[in-house]
């Protein structure tokens, strides 16, 4: 099966918005063992839409079209599809009734413009949208099925998961026996990871893919077929052994997610004191429901005064060692833990750049500490030639990994290939 995607919208074409729908769709299809062969972006011009539908339908087996199903004049996907096939738009009575019911239930009067959303190409098969007013549909043109979906991400995800994936499995007799194992890594580049993994002799049906989402690189191990699925745990275990300390989580999207579930299930508590990461560690944990059960407080102590007054850092420590130092970050972590008697506390202080570095402490120097009931672990890492955002996100990831290793009773301080460290 040859799968393609057509993304519509002037704002997408002009780069005014980032097309997260395309990234999500491609990733989701990969998890089902299907690779997108081509993606095309086209603006809201009728003749361009008609042309791309006609052209790509000669080459693909199925095309997911995203966007252009709204009620406004620049929503042209249905009309363009009808013209591409040489048939009229007709009102879908079922969807009109759904629209009227939706507005009634929400105590709103339906604008006449919304009736446009019930107008589908004559040969279209309606595709349900249980969470919005944009009617999905599919049409056969030349060799391809074109599957039309709304641009609203929440609606797209429902339609792809509940309608599109079952459709292509049935229509193209796809093997549903596909399993996926994800390994999340930090501290090594994609090429370095590939150098270690590509020499491996993998069993038939096992393939490896890489996805860079800094500060992480995700390794996806696909198993297609019953025999490959049976050996997937063994293969994944061997890959973890080969990569060593680079692997920080399994089947999680982020290291923050890994930490969230470990703390949630342990009953242990955490406090955070952040300087250069500016609340990033705390914010990433709060993204997950239930974090209030373990996250006692998150403090952004950016100034030296706040480090002294809020966390109890000794002024002489700052005078003697500076804000970005092992001594200071250890006192920050101890102070944050003691405020509410947390089981653990993380602290960061660094120079994220692009200014502020010195010969002794260049941009990218970050001190990180983990305070426990039994003591404090600390390190000062080097992240040269990284952007400000990447310095902050990598620092947060290293802090998380220190806590993760402590929770697993492993060595808290480890070497990462692409992250340097100052000697104490």
Curated annotation (Swiss-Prot):
It comes from the Bacteria. SUPFAM superfamilies: CinA-like, Molybdenum cofactor biosynthesis proteins. NCBIfam families: cinA_nterm, molyb_syn, PncC_domain. Belongs to the CinA family. This is CinA-like protein.
